[in-house]
Curated annotation (Swiss-Prot):
Organism in which the protein naturally occurs: Salmonella choleraesuis (strain SC-B67)
BP GO terms, sorted: anaerobic electron transport chain; nitrate assimilation
Stored Pfam families: Cytochrom_C552 (PF02335)
Protein name: Cytochrome c-552
Enzyme class: oxidoreductase
Record-listed substrate binding positions: 216, 264
Subcellular location: Periplasm
Gene: nrfA
Amino acid sequence: MARKTLRARRFFSLIFPFFFITSVYAEQTPVSAKTVTVEAKNETFAPQHPDQYQSWKATSEQSAREDALAEDPRLVILWAGYPFSRDYNKPRGHAYAVTDVRETLRTGAPKTAEDGPLPMACWSCKSPDVARLIQQEGEDGYFHGKWARGGPEIVNDLGCADCHNTASDDFAQGKPALTLSRPYAERAMEAIGKPFEKAGRFDQQSMVCGQCHVEYYFDGKNKAVKFPWDEGMKVENMEQYYDAIAFSDWTNSLSKTPMLKAQHPEYETWSAGIHGKNNVTCIDCHMPKVQNAEGKLYTDHKIGNPFDNFAQTCANCHTQDKASLQKVVAERKQAIHDLKIKVEDQLVHAHFEAKAAWDAGATDAEMKPILNDIRHAQWRWDLAIASHGIHMHAPEEGLRMLGSAMDKAADARTKLARLLATKGITHEIPLPDISTKEKAQKAIGLNMQQINAEKQDFLKTVVPQWEDQARKNGLLSQ
């Protein structure tokens, strides 16, 4: 009866920037090679779908920024040599998708369309303009070049055309018209035996979210987005896949380990949990059916915590009261957090001990099995913690991954102790003071004053040019 009830209730200054920047970006005018049907301006659909649009717009209320590095400075060491050691904030509302990727220190401070540390692929989950560009340029064309190339093009926040076929008759008639607007996501679903077009309505609801809330990597010369699901979606399956192709996201600057960085694997972890196994979808919990002022039901697009809409979400299946379920979730969250910190402590020591071994003259052959253990330990830890809701989606799987991460980290440290002893080092390897984010960043050699200054200059000069160009090209509303 509870399941039947659930199914019944479903559904961004400066005006005159520097001339050289102006000239660089003014050359970027869109050339449409194909017929483009994706309308990326979300406000276009407000008259037709007012309740959905206003609730989507309300994600701007989710404006608080939580600095994960300040909260847990160990992360700086684990990501030494990678942009995440500069800046890592917890996610906030969809209305900030474009703003946040522009403002994060991870994307650097490019001055031209060919400048900067990251590829175009870093826009891929931020805007319906991505779907528009893929349709216009093809996947290879979209992925080609640096992240800054997309600045004047990708300007509308994650919204309608990311999940809905807004050009379809069904959408015009008020139906969801769900779609996978990223072809690479469609291929990934097929790889795990879930072709989108053959999936049922409930499966499609989660698959649409799974275009972005997933683990992915940048493949080949073009740095195209690919999901590592060829061997399956469990942490070991993806680890095996990455090892087989000898892939690494970066090399840790302390231990010289070829590392893997997990992204936001909510689809994978949800699939492994009790809700996923029972096909309780992302929409059921995060986008419930609610009533407008006239009593008409619509799908709430202010994606958020299910407890904020308890009667329309959890209570559809659970008989416990809100306080009881909150207590259960809090206990699971604390258990995962406690084990997470223990694994991080082991990994921090392992990275510094590996550095000491290299400094003492260790060879590549001696270090290879150790670095492999560090790689696998941190990968398993990261896949567990990068999914911010794992304590709700799959707590048992989270604890299992963290447990295996602890075992791998212990294996690495045991081998390091033996290797260091052969080099005449039997004392404990001391750690620098990493008690704050700032001290940890100093310990790995980051010049944060320079990095921050360059970013502020970028935001004051380049970004306004992007927006001006987008308005001239009709990509942003005036």
